[in-house]
C-alpha cells in the first residue's frame, strides 16, 4: 500500500464506492480563542495491490505547530484493507493546534512505510468568536 495524496474536509463519506465531499481541500481554518484542536475529516488517496488485501495497516497523523511543538502521532488508527480501494476517509477527528494559531503542519503516514503526505494549514484564532472550542 502506498499513500499518494490527502486533504482535510468538513465532511466526507463513501457512497456507492464513490467519494462525496463537502468543504474540502483546506489551506486554512478558523478557531475560537483558547481552542487547542480543530475538528475535521481527512481524505487519503492510496494505491493498493492484491497483496495488501486482508493486511492490517497503521495510519498516523503527526502534527507540528509554529513554535516547534510536535505531536507524534497526533492521531493513530489501524485498519484492514478489505478490497481494492483508491481512497479512505477518517471518521470525524480532532487534531491539535497551538492556542496562538499560525502555520501548522500535519503529516499523514503509514506505519513502517516511507511515504509521507504533508498538509500545511494556517490556523487563525478569532477572539470572542461563536465557534465552539474543540
Predicted regions and their residues:
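Contiguous segments within soluble domain cores/interaction surfaces
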Residues: 2-134
